[in-house]
Design a protein with these regions (language model features):
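12-transmembrane solute porter fold
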Residues: 1-181
Length: 182
């Protein structure tokens, strides 16, 4: 799941500044501020998840966080249309950052908690590899989708972000299924 949430986050975050620049005429500096907002709410989400100490609450963090990230990512889609203000993407990215902030560290804690101490290094490596692979695969896939949909003008951004939403929806579904059996 960490590869999914991280890959979808990074991929969307790569395309949002380009969308704001191309569709809404924002300067690169203005468009780049969206990455700051996502980082700030990621930190807030991480802080919040660190305050959850009940086992039941900790088990829910990945599904709640993934759901929030999905909603926030979907909220950025309307900003791909010139008639909708680019600020919509900023608001959506605030929400998405909160979601990944809840999920990402909770998955690390969960992974290490179910691993014997002598295998923590392996688990940590596997989580890092999932992050890297998720990011690399989704960015590459999104680049292919964007190139294929480029003739659709601003709708090419919709294609990419919607694809990341589908991936997050899959992650949400898988996480909810795992929670039923763990």
């Amino acid at each position: 799941l960490r590869g999914i949430v991280n890959g979808a986050f990074i991929t969307t975050e790569i395309f949002l500044p380009l969308m704001l620049k191309e569709v809404h005429g924002w300067s690169p500096t203005q468009a780049g501020l969206i990455m700051t907002t996502g980082s700030v709410t990621w930190a807030v989400g991480s802080w919040i998840q660190g305050k959850v100490d009940s086992p039941a609450g900790r088990r829910l963090l990945p599904i709640v966080g993934t759901g929030i990230q999905l909603v926030g990512t979907a909220m950025t889609i309307p900003a791909a249309f010139p008639s909708v203000g680019g600020i919509v993407a900023l608001v959506g990215w605030l929400v998405a950052g909160l979601g990944i902030g809840l999920t990402y560290p909770a998955l690390t804690v969960h992974g290490l908690a179910i691993t014997p101490p002598d295998r923590h290094g392996m688990t940590s490596s596997a989580l890092s590899l999932a992050d890297t692979m998720g990011g690399a695969l989704f960015v590459a896939w999104a680049g292919i989708l964007f190139a294929a949909a480029f003739a659709l003008d601003h709708l090419a951004f919709v294609v990419v972000i919607a694809a990341m939403c589908l991936i997050l929806a899959l992650g949400f579904w898988v996480t909810s299924r795992v929670l039923e059996i763990t």
